Structure formats: C-alpha cells, structure tokens
Amino acid sequence: MKSIRKGKMWRRTAAAALTLTLILPAALPAAAAALTVGGNPAERAKEVLEKLESQHVSAPDAKKLSDVAIQAMIESLGDPYTQYFTPEELTEFENAVANRYVGIGVRVSQQPDGVYIAEVFDGPAREAGIRVGDVIVKVGEQSVVGAPLGEATSLIMGEPGTEVKLRLVRDGAELEKTVKRQQIQVPVVTGKRFEGGVAYVRVTSFSSDADEQVAALLEYFKSQGEIKGLIVDLRDNPGGLLDTAKEMARLFVKEGTLIHTKNRNGLDEPVTFSGGEVQPFPVYMMVNGSSASASEVLTGALQDYKAAIAIGTKTYGKGSVQNVIPLDQGGALKVTVEEYLTPHQRPVNRVGLEPDIAVEGGQVPELLTALRTAGVGSFSLELRRINLTVNGHAVEDSFRVLREGGQTYVPARVLAAVLGAKVAWDAVTSSAKLQSQDGSIVYAPSGTGSKLQDGVTYVSLSQAAEFFRSLTWSDDGQVLKLGG
C-alpha cells in the first residue's frame, strides 16, 4: 500500500458534501498580501477579532468569532471547492476517500416494510449472523418502518465500540441481533469475470492503493484465461488521489500527459507519466453524472489516447484542482489552485466528458450495454427485491418492477438492453418502439401493454413475449427471472 506522504499528489472528497478534490504537492501559499492604506489586512482582521472578544457586551467566544470569519472569507470567493476543515471534519474527509466509516458493515435500502439489507461486508454484522435479505424493523426501541433512510442509518451508526440492538424480519419471522459498532473498510475495488472472457472491475474511490488492487485483479483474471474485453466501472465514483489515477493510467497507456493544469498565473504544469503498458484487449470505461474529478482525469486521458471507450452518460464536470494545506492550529484548508484539461486540452470543469456510447435508462441498461459491447452475447437476470444477478453474478445495479392486475411490468429500456433492442421515441404520438432482430412492438399511451410512471415507460412482459421470440421470463411475486 502506498503511504500518504507530505508533498505527494493526492486528492480528496469532503465527507459531508461529497465534494471532489484533487490535491497536488502541498506548498504554502505565497505571503504576498498587498498592504493597503489601512495597513496589513491580516493584522487588521486579527485586531478586530481581539477587540470584539475583549470588549463586546455579549462576551463572544473567540473560536466562534474565528469560525465565522473563516467561513465569511471562504464564501466571499464564490468557490464551492475551497473549504475549511476542523480536525474532526478532516478525519471524516480522509475516511471518505478511503471508504471507511463507523457502523456495522452493511449496505441498505429503504423498503416499505423496513430497512432492507442489500449487502453484508466483512465485519460485525456478518459475525452476528445478519444476512442479505434481512429487513430491519427496529433500531433499539425505535421503529424504522417508513422512516427516511438517512434517519434509519444514523440510528444504526455510532461511536466505535458501542452496541446497537436490531430487530429483524427474516422469512416472515422476527429475530433480534446485538451488534458492536466498529470502523468498517468498504472495498473500493471489486470484480467478476463473465462468460466470453469479459472481465469487470468496479472502482468506487481512487484510494491510496486502488491502482494496486486493480492491477492485482487484472493479473488474476488473466490467470483464469484469455481476456477478450475489460470493463472498468467508474459510475458514482467521486474521485480520490490524483497519484492513483496516474498509476491506473499506466495500466493502459505507455507514457504521456495525464492532465494539463492552469494556475492563477496562466502557467501550464502538465502531469506526466511513463513506464506504462498497453493491454492486448479492448477497454471500456463506464461513467455517469456522478463520475467526477479523478474519475474524469482517468477517463479523459484514456479517451484521448484511444485506450478506452467510455459508455454511459456525461460525467460530473469537476475540473479544478485543490491543495489540502494542514494548519498549524489544527484542521486544514482546501484551496482551489488550478484548473485541469485532458491531454488533448479538452475542458472538464463545469462541462464534463461526453461518453463515446451514450446510454439512457439508468443503471441496468448502462451495465448490460457495456457487457454486450465487451462481448457478452446473452443475459439471464434474476431480481429479488433490489438484489440483482446478471448471468449468475451479483451486481449493485437494480431496477424497479411493477406488478399490477396480474401483469408484470419492467422499464422499457431494461427490456431493450436485455434483448439487444433499440428504443425509438415518437414525441408526436408519445409512443415508444422497441425493435430487435427477432421482433418489434410499439407502446402507445392508450395501449394496454405499457404504463407510464414517474417519467418511465414500463412494459408488460407477457405482451412483449408475444413479439420477441428470444424473451424468457417468470415471476412468482418475489423473484423475477428475465432472459434474452
């Protein structure tokens, strides 16, 4: 694992606001504040603070005055990425980059009957026997049925070493578990190998050793047989360390410029790399509107060098660079010092990066499109509540199912992605047409085979099966199986 050293390029994400940051070699800002008629501005501000503290009738607290003054200075810049961190906030910030938090080690989703356990990591929840599919209905003595997810998770999380009592429902029966909270390390790199030699790697943060984990996983996949295509999933990845993005680029490009940077003086200080390699198979980067900063650095570089094809939706557009500067009095100041461009001088800030293959319809169509493009020929999906498997592999993506009047409806774009069909929208008639090699169907607003809900067109599987010979499906009300 790479250590985080003073002077090393790194980048961070503020825990509270999910702010994305790039950190270059730390350097103290030049103390070049111009003197004004009123004297030294810093001394003047200090004098005002001291006079208010010592003479104001309310006997104000010096720390409170200082915090307000700091916040006012930062707000005057109009820059959402420049921030002051207290020591506690700095720790939260560092934990966010490393995907660490204090809790019991589960990924959850709010469902009508409680808090659904979607994934269990290594940690106290697994040791206590909590399983995927369990539903939390009470935390302590407080019901979480119908509660906002944020409220429920705040009850579950807490101080390390403390215990939380959970009431769960499993297969219709209630049971109680007492779990001790501890610091949880959520995996930042996971992967799986699909049939046809398609390897899939998901990176959720550019932590200090994410590049090493990706490299190790890639070598493991190679040892299992020839790789015909590699998918690197950066969706919802807010960034991390710039050095990690650079090292990851070396897995796919021999040498070059990672980014161009433009500082306050208009000078370009390019970040370069060498000693890389070129993979003998096509590489596909999955991105979306929450792929930001280091995710955009890597994607932009691989696009410019024709080393990868980006699939999904336009990225976030976080193209500025921050230094995190430790303060002598504790905490740190994160200051925007540069903007960056891709190797071919494409802007990123506030505009994002366009994918090479645009996909509409959300998570599952994005994933299936990437898998099909990489070489997976057919799909078998199984959905239990929100837990989805694709060709036998558990994935984090999911989709909503409507069950009404004895019919099962799925999003039209999910069905299209399963079948490899195209979706054409007719704005005049407000109808959607699905067409593949073995059939086609038109869904009109007044038709019986579709429903429009929350802006999404859902289509009846029983009706679709009459038009698409390759479609197979079954639904017992709990588990939906869908193939094509």
Regions found by a protein language model. Give the residues of each.
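Extended, small/polar residue-biased N-terminal targeting/export presequences
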Residues: 53-116, 163-165, 169-178, 186, ...
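Active-site-adjacent mobile loop/cap segments within catalytic or ligand-binding domains
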Residues: 339-363
